[in-house]
């Protein structure tokens, strides 16, 4: 995520974020009263951005207004961060038109209605690899008190066969739609990764060895796609502690992901 400064003359005021919307899935069965409930799936959040702008004169006011319109039209999506919660971001899109509200000849206010895209969750700006490499104290110094991190569980790179990792978010990490990268070095091409907490097991049995990288739904061994040599299953990470067992030859294994929050 790259920080993008707002145009000169504009002062961001606030961000208002709704709860996550849900879509309920039901079906009607002939001869039965009511509907069959199949549960819900998350949709998106509504996000409202407010800002002021202060121009030099009435001509400059119009130029600033047009500059802001062009600014928000230049990006397909943006990440927004609350100043008082600087560790997490929301990915948003702005599809609806908006207009300024003129307060004086030089001062105006704009309210922009946006919504989340890809997933509706707050996501940590840092990854667990950064937490592992820099340590908890360095992360606190950079971001402040952060995100339910367990100070006793900040290790995400292991040489042991049995270990546990901590998902500080309150959302289960799903590799289909969220960032999760597992790297195992020094394998002989045959490896089994078990998350004993979720019951998920990933297996690969290739004809050559090397460094194994499972990046979301992509599996490569020494840069070669080996998806067909796997059991085509992936590992989720529930909120809190996840107990792992590794079976097979490896040098070290790193579990890199971001924390997600409702």
Short names for language-model regions:
Residues 122-130:
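Short, charged, solvent-exposed linker or helix-capping segments at domain edges/interfaces
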Residues 41-79, 88:
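Compositionally biased, low-complexity regions
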Residues 51-55, 98, 116-120, 186-188, ...:
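Beta-strand elements of well-folded, non-transmembrane domains
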Residues 77-122:
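Short beta-strand and beta-hairpin "edge-sheet" elements
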Residues 129-262:
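Intrinsically disordered, low-complexity segments enriched in serine, threonine, and glycine
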Residues 34-59, 106-120, 242:
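Oligomerization/assembly interface segments of phage tail-like spikes and tubes
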Residues 1-44, 89-100:
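Solvent-exposed edge beta-strands and adjacent loop segments
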Residues 28-31, 59-66, 177:
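Charged, amphipathic alpha-helical segments
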């Amino acid at each position: 995520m790259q920080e993008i400064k707002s145009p000169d003359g504009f002062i961001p005021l606030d961000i208002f974020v709704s709860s996550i919307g849900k879509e309920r899935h039901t079906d009607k069965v002939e001869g039965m009263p009511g509907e069959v409930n199949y549960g819900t799936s998350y949709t998106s959040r509504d996000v409202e951005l407010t800002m002021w702008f202060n121009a030099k004169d009435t001509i400059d006011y119009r130029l600033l207004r047009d500059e802001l319109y062009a600014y928000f039209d230049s990006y397909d999506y943006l990440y927004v961060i609350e100043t008082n919660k600087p560790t997490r971001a929301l990915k948003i899109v702005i599809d609806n038109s908006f207009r300024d509200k003129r307060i004086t000849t030089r001062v105006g206010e704009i309210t922009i209605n946006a919504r989340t895209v890809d997933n509706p969750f707050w996501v940590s700006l840092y990854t667990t690899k950064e937490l592992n490499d820099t340590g908890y104290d360095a992360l606190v110094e950079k971001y402040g008190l952060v995100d339910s991190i367990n100070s006793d569980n900040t290790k995400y790179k292991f040489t042991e066969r049995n270990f546990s990792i901590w998902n500080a978010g309150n959302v289960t990490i799903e590799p289909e739609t969220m960032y999760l990268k597992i790297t195992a070095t020094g394998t002989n091409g045959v490896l089994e990764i078990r998350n004993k907490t979720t019951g998920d097991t990933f297996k690969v049995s290739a004809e050559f060895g090397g460094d194994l990288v499972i990046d979301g739904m992509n599996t490569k061994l020494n840069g070669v796609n080996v998806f067909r040599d796997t059991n085509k299953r992936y590992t989720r990470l529930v909120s809190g502690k996840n107990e792992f067992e590794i079976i097979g030859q490896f040098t070290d294994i790193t579990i890199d992901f971001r924390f997600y929050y409702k």
